[in-house]
Structure formats: structure tokens, C-alpha cells
Design a protein with these regions (language model features):
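Short glycine-biased active-site loop of nucleotidyltransferases that positions the nucleotide triphosphate
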Residues: 193-197
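Core alpha/beta nucleotide-donor-binding catalytic domains of modification enzymes
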Residues: 2-145, 151-168
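Conserved Class I S-adenosyl-L-methionine
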Residues: 163-183
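Secondary-structure boundary elements
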Residues: 140-144, 176-182, 207-218
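S-adenosyl-L-methionine-dependent DNA methyltransferase catalytic core
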Residues: 1-52, 201-424
Length: 424
């Protein structure tokens, strides 16, 4: 049995992890993946010695990326193909079932505290019930380990049962359905596993009761997982500053000719000034830009007329009105904001290419992060393949796939813990 990782379980550096390739040795455990996305999280399991026996992803573009990297059979719609997946997996002595249901309706932005307590509201979005489909697969296949990952609100969301007769929180439904398993459910920040971003997520780990109790306890405690890094980025610039500089003002400056993922959207005219007038390394917002006419910086945020000289502050986010005047754009202080240079990155999201979104601007350069930088901050190894067919429209779809993924460093460390559990 094991209780924690030892010094021999340490990996030398974050850079070494990014340089990892798929293992060529015989697989050490098996897994199936539901709501697999592009297979980014599954890639970490493969790096740890896992063999994917089945995946399920409804979007053809994401499924294509999964196939290019994982090579497992991929089913489409879990609701309509669930029976086929169960038939395929039964009798295979599955070690792990991992499920990452769609999270949009559970997210902080779309699930205010009051709505989190409203099961009727939850019932209006059919995606909220998809985890029930995963539970049915788990109950019928009976893998040794079941792993759910989702946004922080996921476990506490009140929801109705599929027949509408029972109301409870998601974590209560999970525990009730998996009664033959020991359970651990919690919200954690993946930075504690050495991912260089603030990424708070719900995780729920279930270990079948026939697994040794002490061994199961260590598997369910992320602090005990092997694969910790001896060297890791202290801040965002430590992680990404080795890449060529980019600038969003001109097309020839906005892309790296040697890396199709290292490119950024263009911002011209006043939009570029909203970014360029934010001091580098300041962590400030364009709402705080000094007046470009007189240099005064005392005008309060969300105001676009200088209180000293009375001129329009075109370098702050605004909308031009029919009469020629401007009004401030409605938004939050964290929109149009540089990331802090001396901290790890904020959460990588599917909206990484939108500079108006929350904390999306590079700490020192005049642009958003590139998809390559987002991939690094999500701890996605360089060996992960991005087929050309999925890199259209300046890789916006790649950005979505990156933002919604479980960081492979997390699943790699979980996979290493599974290997220790199964070989104890």
C-alpha cells in the first residue's frame, strides 16, 4: 500500500513534463472516458500508463482530436449510445471511469448562488442531467475507480432526479448511486498539483469497497499523488516568457511563423490603445488608463470623460453614440485587464481570445494570450497533436478545447496514483 509520494516519485521540472511523449511500454491500467472533449485530460492518463478502452464525445471536431491523440474508439451521444458503451465495457475489468460532464450551466457565471438552490431552474437545461447518464454507466460496468471533475458549483447544485420525484444536491446523487464505493468529494485548486494557474474545480473520487481501505484513502487524497514537480513556474512569465513576443497591432507581429498555435487576434485603432495604454506588469485594467490628452490619471473607473481636462478618454472602453459623444461600455473591472506578472495565471477559459473577457490580457505585451500559451498554462505536453483541420479561424476552436479541459498534469498524477494503488 502507499500513503504518499516519495522523492523518487518527483518529476524534475514543469518543462520536463511538457516535453513528455506517450509511454511506449505496456499499459498499467485501463480507463473509459465520458464527455471526453478533445482527449486532453485523457492524454495525461495515457502518459501515466493508462489505456483508453472507450471514449464518448458528441462533438465531431473534439472527437477527431481525441482519436488523433488517444486512438481509442469514440462514441457520440451518451444518451442514445449508452447501451452500446456498456455492452463494450462489460467484462473488461475496467480500472477507471472518468466523467467530465458539460459545465456551462453549473459555472459561476451562469449559476448565481440563489439559482444554485433552485432545482426547477436546473431542470431547464438538459445538460444538468447528463451526469445521471454517466452514473448509469458506472453502476452497470462497476469500474474499480470513478472520477468526476467539474466547476466549483457542480457538487452543491440542487437538481431533480430524472423522474422528477427526488430533489438533492449533485454530490448526494453521486454518493447514493455509488453505494459500493468509498467516496471523496471536494473543491480544490489545481495549482496545488503544480498547474501554473488558479483553477478551482470540484472533484469526486469513488473507490470500490474491495480495494484496500488505506490504499483507497491515499488515492482519494490529491496531496498523496505521485508526480510532484521539483521545479515549477513561480508566476505566469516563468511559464511562457520563452516564447517569441507578439503584438496585436499588425498581422505580421501577431503570429509566430513556426507555431500555428502561437498567434493572437488583431486589435486596431482605439481598441489597441485600450490595451497599449495599460502599463506593463501593472495588473491594471484599461478602465484605469490615464487621460491620453492631459495625462491625468484621477478619473474614476467606468468614466470616459476626463475630470481634469474634460476631453473624451478614447483609450478607455467606450461606445461611440450617434451624436458623436461616447459612453462607457458596461462591464466588470476585471475585463480589459492585464494578468498579474508576479502571480500564476488566472483560470484558462474557453474565451481566452476575447480581450473584453475576465483577466485575459498578457502581463507585459499588448495582446491576449496565444493558444500555445494557454496550452502551456493548462500543462498540455508539447507532444499533444492539434490536427490542421481543427485549427481554422485563428484556432478559436482549439482555444475552446484547451479552456474546457482537465489539465493533463492533474490526470497524469492521478494516473500514477492509480498505478500505485493497483500494484500495491
Amino acid at each position: 500500500m502507499f500513503t504518499a509520494f516519495t522523492t523518487k516519485d518527483l518529476m524534475p521540472s514543469f518543462a520536463e513534463f511538457l516535453a513528455k511523449n506517450k509511454p511506449k511500454r505496456a499499459p498499467k491500467f485501463t480507463f473509459a472516458s465520458l464527455f471526453s472533449g478533445a482527449g486532453i485530460g485523457d492524454f495525461g492518463l495515457v502518459l501515466a500508463g493508462g489505456k483508453c478502452l472507450a471514449a464518448c464525445e458528441i462533438d465531431p471536431q473534439r472527437a477527431a482530436v481525441h482519436k488523433a491523440n488517444i486512438g481509442a474508439p469514440v462514441w457520440g451521444n451518451l444518451r442514445t449510445e449508452k447501451a452500446s458503451i456498456i455492452k463494450h465495457l462489460r467484462g473488461l475489468d475496467l480500472d477507471l471511469l472518468i466523467a467530465t460532464p458539460p459545465c456551462q450551466s453549473f459555472s459561476t457565471a451562469n449559476s448565481r448562488r440563489g439559482l444554485r438552490e433552485d432545482p426547477d431552474h436546473a431542470g431547464r437545461d438538459e445538460r444538468n442531467n447528463l451526469f445521471f447518464e454517466a452514473l448509469e454507466v458506472a453502476r452497470k460496468v462497476k469500474p474499480k475507480i470513478v472520477f468526476f471533475e467539474n466547476v466549483p458549483n457542480f457538487l452543491k447544485r440542487k437538481i431533480q432526479s430524472q423522474d422528477g420525484t427526488v430533489v438533492g444536491r449533485v454530490e448526494e446523487f453521486l454518493s447514493a448511486a455509488l453505494g459500493g464505493y468509498r467516496a471523496h468529494a471536494n473543491v480544490m485548486c489545481f495549482s496545488s498539483l503544480h498547474v501554473p494557474q488558479r483553477r478551482r474545480r470540484s472533484i469526486a473520487i469513488f473507490v470500490r469497497n474491495d480495494i484496500d481501505k488505506t490504499t483507497a484513502a491515499a488515492l482519494m487524497d490529491p496531496a498523496c499523488w505521485p508526480g510532484a514537480l521539483k521545479e515549477r513556474p513561480a508566476n505566469i512569465l516563468d511559464a511562457i516568457s520563452h516564447l517569441p513576443e507578439l503584438d496585436s497591432s499588425q498581422a505580421e507581429l501577431a503570429a509566430d511563423a513556426d507555431d500555428p498555435l502561437h498567434q493572437v487576434p488583431l486589435h486596431e485603432g482605439v481598441h489597441y490603445s485600450w490595451i497599449s495604454d495599460i502599463p506593463a506588469r501593472s495588473g491594471r485594467s484599461s478602465w484605469e488608463n490615464a487621460c491620453s490628452n492631459c495625462g491625468d490619471d484621477s478619473t474614476p473607473i467606468f468614466q470616459v470623460v476626463c475630470q481634469l481636462c474634460g476631453q473624451a478618454m478614447l483609450n478607455r472602453p467606450h461606445v461611440l453614440q450617434k451624436d458623436g459623444s461616447i459612453r462607457p461600455i458596461k462591464g466588470f473591472k476585471t475585463s480589459y485587464t492585464r494578468m498579474a506578472a508576479d502571480q500564476i495565471a488566472p483560470t484558462m477559459t474557453t474565451a481566452s481570445g476575447h480581450f473584453s473577457s475576465d483577466l485575459k490580457l498578457h502581463p507585459t505585451q499588448n495582446r491576449v494570450l496565444s493558444a500555445r500559451e494557454c496550452a502551456i498554462l493548462q500543462a498540455i505536453p508539447d507532444s499533444f497533436v492539434w490536427p490542421k483541420e481543427q485549427r481554422f479561424r485563428k484556432a478559436y476552436l482549439v482555444r475552446e478545447m484547451i479552456g474546457e479541459a482537465v489539465p493533463p498534469l492533474v490526470t497524469f498524477r492521478f494516473g500514477k496514483a492509480i498505478v500505485k494503488t493497483l500494484t500495491s
